[in-house]
A protein has these predicted regions:
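Short glycine-rich catalytic loops that host catalytic nucleophiles or stabilize transition states
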Residues: 211-218
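Short alpha-helical functional segments enriched in proximate histidine and acidic residues
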Residues: 18, 221, 237
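Flexible "cap/lid" subdomain of the alpha/beta-hydrolase fold that forms the substrate-access gate
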Residues: 2-16, 20-21, 25, 30, ...
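Gly/Ala-rich beta-loop-alpha elbow adjacent to hydrolase catalytic centers
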Residues: 31-35, 39
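Short, hydrophobic alpha-helical segments
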Residues: 152, 234-241
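Short, hydrophobic alpha-helix immediately C-terminal to the catalytic nucleophile
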Residues: 40-44, 145, 231, 235
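Catalytic histidine-centered segment of alpha/beta-hydrolase-like enzymes
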Residues: 189-194, 218-231
Length: 241
């Protein structure tokens, strides 16, 4: 699969077949990160049965930055990431290559990232085991990331980010008046405040019914960092009226 469209369809076409068999009508679709980008594309192609779209820290909302720092001028760690991404090396491949050391590495990452949530040892182990096994499983959709997204470092802020090759701000439109809610964490590495707010304003001018909400005390995994506020938002905004 080479084009962005082909890689997006790899995900959303099977989802449509599944939901059609379930005979779902008037439902709310919620997607996170790359899943948010894919959910928006799903709604553009198959949105006639959707009542609402909720995007949690979606990738690819703002436009590509006009000026970026080239790979040769990046710190060594960033150059390695750029090289790996360009070669389509995925986190799953790295975990699988580590063999029996993989579970320990994933456990350490989970324990460090979510230390503030106060999970006990058993909770951390369960989440770590889950993430390890879905990451170490035979690769499939992970190989599409390079075709859909691209890591870039903005020249004006020297801030790294991941952007869509076909940003949502340039393509998001729906045949029906579909309400769209975008949520980011206040410490979310995908939330570029100025650019995301401008994207939302542009989409509103284009006629979309879209809102942007920032969830406090949360990062990219806002549903874990602040589940109360995220859950309350979803439950309070799932009306079909």
């Amino acid at each position: 699969l080479q084009s962005v469209e082909d890689n997006v369809n790899f995900f959303i076409d099977p989802l449509e077949r599944c939901l059609s068999k379930l005979k779902l009508e008037n439902y709310v679709l919620c997607g996170h990160s790359l899943g948010g980008y894919l959910s928006a594309n799903f709604a553009m192609k198959y949105g006639d049965k959707l009542s609402r779209l909720i995007l949690l820290s979606p990738a690819g909302l703002p436009p590509l930055p006009s000026r970026t720092i080239g790979p040769k001028d990046l710190p060594m760690a960033m150059r390695l990431i750029d090289s790996a991404w360009s070669s389509n090396v995925t986190p799953g491949q790295i975990v699988r290559a580590m063999g029996h050391r993989g579970p320990t590495m994933v456990h350490r990452i989970v324990r460090g990232r979510f230390r503030s949530l106060g999970w006990n040892d058993e909770q951390t182990r369960v989440i770590s085991d889950y993430l390890y096994h879905i990451t170490a499983a035979p690769g499939s959709g992970e190989f599409s990331m390079n075709s859909i997204l691209v890591p870039l470092v903005r020249a004006d802020t020297a801030r790294p980010g991941v952007f869509a090759r076909e940003p949502l701000v340039h393509k998001m439109n729906f045949s029906n008046r579909l309400p769209v809610h975008v949520l980011y964490g206040d410490n979310d590495w995908l939330y570029h405040e100025k650019e995301c707010n401008e994207a939302i304003s542009n989409l509103r001018r284009d006629g979309l019914e879209i809102s942007l909400n920032v969830i406090p005390k949360s990062g990219h995994h806002l549903y874990l960092d602040n589940p109360k506020d995220v859950n309350n938002f979803i439950l309070n905004n799932n009306s079909n009226t």
